[in-house]
């Protein structure tokens, strides 16, 4: 469905465009893949900085359980911000671009990658990073049931909900692969 698009006007429209596209939504080719790369980069950035903080915590005698809980809490808070702001920005982008699911809006792929990697401990293993990346992209593109039905939800919720569930599917598969590699 195509609606009438309009030029962005005001700070809210520009904020929605910046958040929903991360700038990469305008690159021709595969904006969803580019958005996924941004999500993976954010995961790595957070993970590396949290790993440094964890090392410092261990050096001053902080318990490992507290460090793990803190690590997870920070990523969960960042993810929650992405989800709520992403749903708002994606919804706003439908009005700006005049379509129900503008390909320029990639915040859903960003949050999808972050969710995918919540299912395993932080890793720098390129094999696991590539596997998680590919699994999310496959589920996001394939959209098996009930992922495909979530796109029917209104505006930003419909744009983001299918990617959130695709990330859960990918995360479960990734955690199984991770567990098997530990055996």
What annotation goes with each model-predicted range?
Residues 2-37, 87-116, 137-169:
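Interhelical loop and helix-boundary elements at the membrane-water interface
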Residues 13, 17, 36, 67, ...:
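Residue-level signature of transmembrane alpha-helical entry/exit and packing/kink sites
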Residues 27-46, 74, 82:
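Short Lys/Arg-rich amphipathic alpha-helical segments
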Residues 52-68:
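Membrane-interface interhelical connector segments
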Residues 75-86, 175:
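Hydrophobic core of alpha-helical transmembrane segments in multi-pass integral membrane proteins
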Residues 120-127, 183:
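Transmembrane helix interruption/hinge and helix-loop junction motifs
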Residues 175-183:
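Juxtamembrane boundary at the C-terminal end of a transmembrane helix
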């Amino acid at each position: 469905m195509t609606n009438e698009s309009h030029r962005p006007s005001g700070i809210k429209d520009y904020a929605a465009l910046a958040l929903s596209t991360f700038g990469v939504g305008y690159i021709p080719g595969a904006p969803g893949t580019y958005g996924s790369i941004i999500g993976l980069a954010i995961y790595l950035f957070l993970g590396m900085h949290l790993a440094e903080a964890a090392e410092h915590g261990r050096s001053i005698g902080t318990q490992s359980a507290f460090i793990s809980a803190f690590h997870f809490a920070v990523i969960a808070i960042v993810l929650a911000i992405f989800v709520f702001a992403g749903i708002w920005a994606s919804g706003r982008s439908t009005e700006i671009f005049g379509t129900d699911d503008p390909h320029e809006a990639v915040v859903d792929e960003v949050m999808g990658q972050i969710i995918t990697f919540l299912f395993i401990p932080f890793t720098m293993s390129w094999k696991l990073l590539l596997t998680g990346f590919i699994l999310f992209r496959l589920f996001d593109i394939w959209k098996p049931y009930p992922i495909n039905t979530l796109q029917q939800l209104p505006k930003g919720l419909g744009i983001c909900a299918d990617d959130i569930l695709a990330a859960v599917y990918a995360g479960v598969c990734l955690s199984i692969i991770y567990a098997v590699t530990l055996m």
